[in-house]
Amino acid sequence: MLFQNDETMEFLKALIRIGEVSSVDASKATARVVFDDFDSVVSYDLQVICRNTFANRDYAMPDIGEDVICLFLPTGTEAGFILGSVYAGDVTPPENTVNRRCVEFLDGAKFMYDRSAHALTITIGDTAITVNQDAVAVESKNTIQAKVG
């Protein structure tokens, strides 16, 4: 074991925790997390780490029930951050290759970029739009409208 000192190990366990989101405050970009390994204690509002928050802004909140990794300040469990989500249990990633970046939504909508094929595909229901360096392809069981100029 890397840490032989029990006190140090307990300190680290208090700083870094894995829990499940129990509520979300979308307007403040915060969430509360329940920690089953700490007698189901619920955290205070924790800030959700975002990629950008100034000139470029990114926004994505975890869902209630989502497993997350949290980091707390050394001053206690009143202030901390949700660093991100982790796949656990029956929940699996929407892709299984390092060449694709994918965002899949609950309703099945999907944004996927394949860097090996240099192609971006957006799928919503039965409609798929694929853009690469040579063409734009639209497939749909419904009406397709295009406007130039």
Q: Model-found features: residue ranges?
A:
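Beta-strand/loop nucleic-acid-binding surfaces
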Residues: 42-59
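Short solvent-exposed strand/turn elements
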Residues: 33-44, 101, 105-107
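Right-handed beta-helix
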Residues: 2-5, 59, 63-67, 73-149
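Conserved hydrophobic positions within beta-strands
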Residues: 21-23, 82
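Short boundary/loop segments of OB/S1/cold-shock single-stranded nucleic-acid-binding domains
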Residues: 1-17
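Short aromatic-glycine-enriched beta-strand elements
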Residues: 27-33
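Helix-turn-helix-like N-terminal two-helix hairpins of bacterial/phage DNA-binding regulators
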Residues: 19, 36, 50-51
